[in-house]
Amino acid sequence: MRRRLLRAAVLAPLAGTLATLPGCSLPVQVDGTFLQPWRSHLQWGLADWQRSLKVAHTLGCRQLVLQWTGIVGGSDGDWSLPDGSLQQLFTAASENDIRIRVGLPFQQRWWQAIGADDATLQAFLAESLAHARRWLAQTPWAQQPAFEGWYLPYELEQYHWADPARQQWLAQWLQGLVQAASARGGDCAMSCYFSRLQTDGNLVTLWQAVLAHAAVRPMVQDGVGVAGAGNVQQLQPLLDHFHAHSIGFDAIVELFRELPGGPADGSGFKGETADAARIQRQLAWARDSGAQHVLVYALEPWLTQDTPQAAALRRRWGLPQ
């Protein structure tokens, strides 16, 4: 799942209706949520962050993964959340007893680089590591009381990383990122998903190579939003490996479904909020997976937006309209 493309489906959230929530127990509780910021979040004030974090708190969230703090090399130019916005996020998080895992700036060239030749990939890894080191050296967020750790905003899958040499380059790159991040304080987490593209690679071998060099916390996407319910079966060998080696991981439940008719490469993604029954089955899988935490992707926008599908999910989850 290329989450960079999900912005195509993002609609304006209900700004006020979810701000005041009932005190009753809700039928769904999750450990955390992602938040994928876009340029529209540059306009958010403290009240917007408070609204978003209040919804998360009501559903039991104790962690929010800020997918990235900005984008480098995007088609509409570089941008980043200003310090004032991030401070407001941390303020709202502290008010709601939620800890923030801060995503590094996302290098948009990632998707092109991992599909390119070896020289292009190696150049990208070197340049992006240097950029991340510079950013980490000056960022203050690890000192915030609500700071949980760092998130590396690059998703691993077995298709582009089947070659052992590339696995080693990836592992060394991640080792550099982890070292730079840990110098500021805090661990690093990174997501993975099962690619439907035909390949000789597999996620177990990939994570073995990564964890031999870099102490990265795995976060496993269920992939149901794009690949369907059967995708979780493809993840079982990886989960078995984590269990056998006592490797802690988190599970990510996708709250959306991809609408048919989009390009096969994932560009121009169009999606909508999934139905509550499907999501309930996903949550049951995640809780039975052995994951230490179950996170959803994502309350914003798939629960909060002003669509009939999101409204139906709010009703099922006992939230006001």
Task: Indicate residue ranges for each PLM-predicted region.
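Substrate-binding cleft of secreted/luminal carbohydrate-active enzymes
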Residues: 225-227, 248-320
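Aromatic-lined carbohydrate-recognition surfaces of secreted/lumenal glycan-active proteins
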Residues: 103-105, 151, 177-201, 220, ...
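N-terminal export signals
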Residues: 4-25
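Active-site groove signature of glycoside hydrolases
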Residues: 135-164, 295
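Catalytic domains of carbohydrate-active enzymes, especially glycoside hydrolases
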Residues: 47-72, 212, 217-218, 286
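Aromatic- and acid-rich polysaccharide-binding/catalytic face
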Residues: 154, 204-231
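Aromatic-lined substrate-binding rim segments of carbohydrate-active enzymes
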Residues: 50-55, 65-109, 166-184
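Boundary/entry segment of secreted carbohydrate-active catalytic domains
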Residues: 24-61
